[in-house]
Amino acid sequence: MPRRKKKGKEASGAQNLEKKDAETASSVSVKKKRRIEDGFIVISDSDGEEPKEENGLQKTKIKQSSRAKCLAKRKIAQMTEEEQFALALKMSEQEAREVNSQEEEEEELLRKAIAESLNSCRPSDASATRSRPLATGPSSESHQEKSTDSGTTEGIWQLVPPSLFKGSHISQGNESEEREEPWDHNENTEEEPVSVSSGSWDQSSQPVFENENVKCFDRCTGHLAEHTQCGKPQNECGRGSAFLKAVQGSGDTSRHCLPTLADAKGLQDTGGTVNYFWGIPFCPDGVDPNQYTKVILCQLEVYQKSLKMAQRQLLNKKGFGEPVLPRPPSLIQNECGQGEQASEKNEGISEDMGDEDKEERQESRASVWRAKTKDFQEGPIKTLKEKLLLEEEPTTSHGQSSQGLFVEETSEEGNSVPASQSIAALTGKRSSVLMPESSAEEITVCPETQLSSPETFDLEKEGFPDSRETLYEVSIMADKEVDNREDAKKEIHTSTFSSSTQVSCPLCDQGFPPTKIERHAMYCNGLMGGDTVLTRRQKEAKNKSDNGIAAQTSLDIDKNEKCYLCKSLVPFREYQCHVESCLQLARVDQGDGPEESGRLCLAVDGKRPQQLKNLKEKDRSEGRLISLLEQSEYKTTDAEIKTKFSETGDFRVPSAGVEEAGCSREMQSSLAHLDLNESPIKSFVSVSEAADCLVDFKKQLTARPGSRTRTKAGRGRRRKS
């Protein structure tokens, strides 16, 4: 019994040894296959398909390398610095050699693969064009052909999808065996003439090339060159050779091997197929071709953007030149001197040179002022009278004609400078009298925006052609000019330039001296009678001053009332009687003439002979005023308006209350044609003047200041809109 057991143990041990030998032989064959596969370039388009055995080998290699690194680190830690340096040099040399050897090996492999692909593509080889002898009879020549062209057949075999086999009842495991069997056959060509596996491979490969499957196979993989031909030569090469030729630089052959998108989709639907990607040159192994193309597109986009940026930097903008000034350089130098003087005064710079310059300027200005005052005292009134009669322009009670307009007219008609100087002096006096001292420093108020005081009204009323030559008027004007010498200096200094040079505003077409055109242009909004635009701080100060002026005018109105017809101030007690007399005079003027109207006016008012002359002139204008009121606003002409205003120089524009009552709508429309700096708020008239109206406004006298503020607010809204 024990002998039998020993025999059974020996038999089982022999079986185990045989199994081990078979396993080792299979492992050796697998290793040899791997070596052969490494020797040839297998071209396949599968994405990331790697056998499991290679992964295992890679893991073992990684473990071994990690162990070696740990040992090397321990050794390096025990070595000195010199030894470490020498070791580093040796390691770098070895790495360089390995890199060079790898490159050389890769080049050799590429050369071999290219040579084999070229040999496989030759249709002249008689042995390559016949695939039947492989199945009919074993021969050493056919096996040698297989061994020489095994690389290309392996590449083509991997490209064939399993679903294309007509009679493919073979499992995927059998397919893998069949793929391995040709390599086993190649190993044993010398020992065994024909193996069973080779016959099975031939039998399984025969249905591939029958009938229509050959065409489909050719569309998917290009075609099968020599090994897979049924007696019909093909001139085109397979896909593997096409790729290798593309590597060499012949990109035209790869176009013949490109499958259509529909074929690729059909292959994907059948299952177990290979995904093909075309059009990406030299895509790295293991990289998604779609992402690789995105990277290429991004690089192109970055290149285009950088090119555009470089082109933009080449463009250089032309620099701005010198500003174009609207005046000659002499005026600029004069203004620069004035600006320096003002800055010295404000900052309080106490320097010797600065004091000398100031004294020289003051002396020069004083000499100019003395010469101008002499000229002014000789004949300012006659020149003013002649100018007003010739020009026939309106002069309102609060100095409506600005300095710029007078200067323009004098330059056109050739009148002398003292006339403009006298007007400048009068306007300077009015602005200084009406504005408070506190707000005079902060804001610059135009004289047109202020109401006239009784003194200036009497002065202008008495300063008409018949009464201007009186000595009383000359003395008043001289006193005012002496009191306001500094203001008059400034006005006369600017008027010396204005007669020769006059700059017109491009927005409102008004003429201004060169020293004032810039300030006007800053605030000009295109309106003919636009006031200077003020800041919030200036508006607040102006509102305060307007409130004080409104209080003063209310006191003045309590004393005197202005007649709307004759534009004269009348005591409040005599106002009603005066208005009735004016109305009677207007009616009589239409029928009998101005002489009877003058008598009635003398009888009712009892004025002095000085007012008789003014009333005669007013009576002439009253007839025209009523005729204008009777006419429609569209039929009035500019000639009638000019004559009317030349004879009645003290007219004011009607107030808002009178306009509501309908007493002067035609008058307002006729005044709209004139380029006057007028508005209802500038020449405010009390409600009691509207005697002919249907509405009784006397009950609303207490609401006068409020109405003034409302109209100002309304004007502000209109300007904003």
Curated annotation (Swiss-Prot):
InterPro entries: Rad18_UBZ4 (IPR006642), RAP80 (IPR038868), RAP80_UIM (IPR040714), UIM_dom (IPR003903). Residues 349-358 have a biased composition (Acidic residues). Residues 505-582 are annotated as: Zinc-finger-like region. There is a cross-link at residues 20, 31, 75, 90, 245, 382, 387, 429, 544, 559, 562, 607, 635, 642, 698-699 (Glycyl lysine isopeptide (Lys-Gly) (interchain with G-Cter in SUMO2)). GO terms for biological process: chromatin organization; double-strand break repair; mitotic G2 DNA damage checkpoint signaling; positive regulation of DNA repair; response to ionizing radiation. CDD domains: AIR_RAP80-like. Keywords: Chromatin regulator, DNA damage, DNA repair, Isopeptide bond, Metal-binding, Nucleus, Phosphoprotein, Repeat, Transcription, Transcription regulation, Ubl conjugation, Zinc, Zinc-finger. It comes from the Eukaryota. The keyword Disulfide bond does not apply. Its main location: nucleus. It is found in: Nucleus. Residues 80-99, 105-124 form the UIM domain. Residues 117-130 have a biased composition (Polar residues). PROSITE patterns: UIM (PS50330), ZF_UBZ4 (PS51908). Residues 400-500 are annotated as: Necessary for interaction with NR6A1 C-terminus. Residues 97-103 are annotated as: UIM-linker. Ubiquitin-binding protein. Specifically recognizes and binds 'Lys-63'-linked ubiquitin. Plays a central role in the BRCA1-A complex by specifically binding 'Lys-63'-linked ubiquitinated histones H2A and H2AX at DNA lesions sites, leading to target the BRCA1-BARD1 heterodimer to sites of DNA damage at double-strand breaks (DSBs). The BRCA1-A complex also possesses deubiquitinase activity that specifically removes 'Lys-63'-linked ubiquitin on histones H2A and H2AX. Also weakly binds monoubiquitin but with much less affinity than 'Lys-63'-linked ubiquitin. Belongs to the RAP80 family. This is BRCA1-A complex subunit RAP80. It comes from Sus scrofa.
